[in-house]
């Protein structure tokens, strides 16, 4: 089957036309404008390609999904999260989880090549596209800070009552998982049922993610993305999923 080539004004083909090998490859071409990305994600499609390749669009079957109700942190992580919850409202706490205070840095860290990998799909062009989408209010970072330093985090796309996880990084033990746990709490507070994990990995499966048939995924997001947007704002995120404003640098609340 010939892979469809998308011009700037060409709509995506139905996801049912995606290839089986490689699984989910649907089309190539088009651009990474906020409008095109919004159209893609709302229909269960995401870009993934190596630098130097044309833009490739994917919709795999099955789709890896983390149901927020099924999030399953390990015993050691649960223990650490309980300890953090006891000190999270202390202004002097060593660890804080924040939202959208260092988006560009999180994106840059996620783009760094991983051990054993020759490169990254988060190319400069992809970074620029998601920075633009972040500026429009649709992409967000959840950040773990330790002693005032960015130690880990993740970023993802938020449409309606649907969250699409993009990438994670950690510079300290459990830093990305702590960010994920706080994100899950925030999403559950706002009736978000699923986090799209895109592709199957053992790491995500150990945290509770499971594959679901693409048809079920598409049916779910059709309803979820039509719901009102979440109340994202920059600030500190607590273990109950509540966002709090950060104090000014001088420590005096305005």
Swiss-Prot record:
GO terms for cellular component: cytoplasm. Its main location: cytoplasm. One of its GO terms (molecular function) is leucyl-tRNA--protein transferase activity. It comes from the Bacteria. It is found in: Cytoplasm. Keywords: Acyltransferase, Cytoplasm, Transferase. SUPFAM superfamilies: Acyl-CoA N-acyltransferases (Nat). It holds the Pfam family Leu_Phe_trans. Its EC number is 2.3.2.6. It catalyses: N-terminal L-lysyl-[protein] + L-leucyl-tRNA(Leu) = N-terminal L-leucyl-L-lysyl-[protein] + tRNA(Leu) + H(+); N-terminal L-arginyl-[protein] + L-leucyl-tRNA(Leu) = N-terminal L-leucyl-L-arginyl-[protein] + tRNA(Leu) + H(+); L-phenylalanyl-tRNA(Phe) + an N-terminal L-alpha-aminoacyl-[protein] = an N-terminal L-phenylalanyl-L-alpha-aminoacyl-[protein] + tRNA(Phe). InterPro entries: Acyl_CoA_acyltransferase, Leu/Phe-tRNA_Trfase, Leu/Phe-tRNA_Trfase_C, Leu/Phe-tRNA_Trfase_N. It is an enzyme of class 2 (transferase). One of its GO terms (biological process) is protein catabolic process. Belongs to the L/F-transferase family. Functions in the N-end rule pathway of protein degradation where it conjugates Leu, Phe and, less efficiently, Met from aminoacyl-tRNAs to the N-termini of proteins containing an N-terminal arginine or lysine. This is Leucyl/phenylalanyl-tRNA--protein transferase. It comes from Bordetella bronchiseptica (strain ATCC BAA-588 / NCTC 13252 / RB50) (Alcaligenes bronchisepticus).
């Amino acid at each position: 089957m010939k892979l469809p080539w998308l011009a700037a004004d060409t709509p995506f083909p139905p996801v049912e036309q995606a290839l089986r090998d490689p699984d989910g490859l649907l089309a190539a071409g088009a651009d990474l404008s906020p409008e095109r990305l919004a159209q893609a994600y709302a229909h269960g499609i995401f870009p993934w390609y190596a630098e130097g390749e044309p833009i490739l669009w994917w919709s795999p079957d099955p789709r890896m999904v983390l149901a927020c109700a099924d999030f399953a942190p390990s015993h050691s992580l649960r223990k650490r999260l309980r300890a953090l919850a006891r000190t999270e409202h202390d202004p002097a706490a060593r660890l804080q989880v924040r939202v959208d205070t260092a988006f560009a840095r999180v994106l840059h860290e996620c783009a760094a090549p991983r051990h054993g990998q020759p490169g990254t799909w988060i190319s400069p062009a992809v970074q620029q596209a998601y920075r633009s989408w972040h500026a429009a209010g649709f992409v967000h970072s959840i950040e773990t800070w330790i002693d005032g330093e960015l130690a880990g985090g993740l970023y993802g796309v938020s449409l309606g009552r649907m969250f699409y996880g993009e990438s994670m990084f950690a510079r300290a033990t459990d830093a990305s998982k702590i960010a994920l746990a706080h994100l899950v709490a925030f999403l559950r507070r706002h009736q978000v049922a699923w986090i799209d994990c895109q592709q199957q990995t053992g790491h995500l499966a150990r945290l509770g993610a499971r594959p679901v048939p693409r048809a079920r995924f598409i049916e779910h997001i059709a309803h979820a993305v039509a719901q009102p947007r979440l109340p994202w704002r920059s600030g500190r995120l607590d273990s109950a999923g509540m966002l709090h404003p950060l104090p000014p640098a001088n420590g005096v609340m305005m």
